[in-house]
A protein has these predicted regions:
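Helix-biased detector of long, well-ordered alpha-helical tracts
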Residues: 1-335
Length: 335
């Protein structure tokens, strides 16, 4: 089956067959009393955000939707609906888009989306994926959100740095294949490669916290590295932030691969990006409840007085200022 046989409308209708979603659904559910709307947008471009030489289309679809719902979770809200526009390049036809869509549907079902909209448009510059995600936040939970304080705990939802190492391994493998026609052996590093190709976010983490009466004082999605999150945290709270190098979680053989690629895993965690982990700050009085009931999260640091800034604390106790691409350094700001 090809686009030339069924056309755009027929293709969209065919893609929805066997899914719990409806094609051309004019979704507009009213918010429940006591809720407020949250919306986020994301654009993903071939050659910038993904490389189809090695990226399985089903994984790409799954990852795209995961990123969209992750943005909603990072707003301390629950995802409800997503509208997707796929820009289809000339080298792709219906079977490839079907594979991409299948991954999107899997992720949408995992996160309980009530609506998944789709449009297909032609693209002259490679595959593109535009996401518009909406969700809701309980007004009572918003009102209960505490003001960030020094000593609030900084918590992350899973290992960091693996995505960048996985990306680097795939890029190296693609280059080697182009040069020598030898396929890379990725079996030893499946978890690390998977962290880049198919990141996962725990769908019920926010609900668990709400049920336990744990209300984060701040929340972020680590998409550009932990350093970027800490910079945002310091800016938004007016406080300092300390993260301890020996508390950062890593996948099992991250350091082995880091040595092979000559990449420091701590640097990958801070500046690599693409991990798509949730980062919360939690009042220190909730530490025991949090540790006991949300064991997939790791406590990696805490907020501090504002003169501290954003720092990484080494195992020897040395505090190193954190820098992130896209942010002006303190020295630059003083000029």
């Amino acid at each position: 089956m090809n686009f030339s046989d069924i056309g755009r409308v027929g293709a969209i209708e065919a893609l929805y067959e066997g899914t719990p979603y409806k094609a051309f659904d004019k979704y507009g559910a009213a918010l429940e009393s006591g809720s407020q709307a949250v919306t986020r947008c994301k654009l993903m471009l071939e050659g910038t955000d993904f490389n189809l030489v090695y990226f399985p289309l089903k994984h790409l679809g799954y990852k795209a939707v995961t990123i969209g719902v992750g943005q909603i979770y990072a707003a301390l809200a629950h995802p409800d609906a997503m509208d997707i526009t796929i820009g289809v390049s000339a080298k792709l036809d219906y079977p490839q888009i079907k594979e991409l869509w299948e991954g999107m549907v899997v992720a949408a079902k995992e996160h309980g989306l009530k609506h998944l909209g789709l449009d297909l448009v032609p693209s002259r510059n490679g595959l593109s994926i535009a996401l518009a995600t909406s969700g809701h936040a309980d007004r009572l939970q918003v009102a209960r959100r505490p003001k960030p304080q020094s000593k609030d705990l900084i918590c992350v939802s899973g290992p960091l740095g693996a995505a960048y190492l996985g990306f680097s391994l795939l890029e190296q493998g693609a280059a080697d294949y182009e040069k020598n026609r030898t396929a890379p052996d990725l079996d030893r590093y499946k978890m690390i490669v998977g962290a880049y190709l198919k990141p996962e976010i725990e769908a019920d983490a926010l609900t668990k916290m709400e049920d336990l009466g744990i209300v984060p004082s701040a929340a972020y999605l680590a998409d550009r590295g932990l350093a970027d999150v800490l910079k945002q945290l310091v800016r938004d709270t007016g406080l300092g932030a300390k993260v301890y190098a020996d508390k950062i979680p890593f996948e099992g053989n991250t350091f082995e691969l880091g040595k092979k690629l000559d990449i420091d895993p701590v640097s990958a965690a801070f500046n690599g990006g693409e991990d798509y982990r949730l980062v919360f700050t939690i009042p220190i009085l909730k530490m025991e409840d949090f540790r006991h009931n949300l064991q997939t999260f790791d406590i990696i640091g805490h907020l501090a007085q504002n003169d501290v800034g954003a720092v990484l604390v080494t195992p020897e106790g040395v505090e190193m200022p954190v820098h992130s691409q896209g942010w002006k350094d303190d020295a630059d700001e003083e000029e």
